[in-house]
């Protein structure tokens, strides 16, 4: 459960109307992430775990936007019903010059947005760029979709898939 301080903080988050236990929990996640982001000096709203991202997305509190390449989505998989706005494309990867314009077509600048990449690195750069142009509630999903590569064989640790969160592959 949450302390009265956490509940009060959640109820004040962005002036949200917080009434149910799930609302309180969702807004507490965002408030905690934002506070940690401010303390760390992040240039975006903050970080959330894959489990927190699923909770926020499945409760329709936030948009989950996949910033990986189209090839990654096709070959590795993706979270159903998530928009795709590639941060970078090509080989070697180059920043998508239309990223901000494409993001603006998917989300309002006041929406709560969770950005997901492979390991949580590209999504940080994408979150910083979005914040710079006025997106106020942009969060990075740490560990990303696949997690961090931990050895030469490509074994990963963490990530959306490792927590058995919903995903599909075409």
Language-model features: where?
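Short, surface-exposed ligand- or partner-binding patches at beta-edge/loop junctions that are enriched
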Residues: 115-116
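Rhodanese-like catalytic fold shared by cysteine-dependent sulfurtransferases
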Residues: 2-62, 70-112, 123-170
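Conserved G/P- and acidic residue-centered "switch" motifs that form tight phosphate/ATP-binding loops
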Residues: 66, 120
């Amino acid at each position: 459960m949450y302390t009265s301080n956490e509940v009060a903080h959640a109820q004040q988050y962005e002036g949200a109307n917080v009434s149910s236990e799930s609302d309180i929990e969702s807004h507490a996640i965002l408030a905690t992430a934002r506070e940690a982001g401010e303390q760390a000096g992040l240039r975006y709203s903050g970080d959330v775990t894959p489990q927190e991202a699923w909770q926020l997305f499945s409760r329709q509190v936030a948009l989950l936007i996949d910033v990986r390449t189209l090839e990654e989505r096709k070959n590795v998989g993706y979270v159903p019903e998530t928009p795709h706005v590639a941060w970078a494309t090509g080989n070697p990867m180059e920043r998508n010059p239309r990223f901000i314009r494409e993001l603006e077509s998917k989300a309002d600048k006041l929406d709560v947005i969770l950005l997901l990449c492979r390991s949580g690195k590209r999504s940080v750069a994408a979150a910083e760029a979005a914040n710079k142009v006025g997106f106020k509630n942009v969060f990075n999903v740490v560990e990303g979709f696949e997690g961090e590569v931990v050895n030469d064989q490509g074994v990963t640790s963490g990530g959306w898939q490792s927590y058995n969160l919903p995903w599909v592959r075409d």
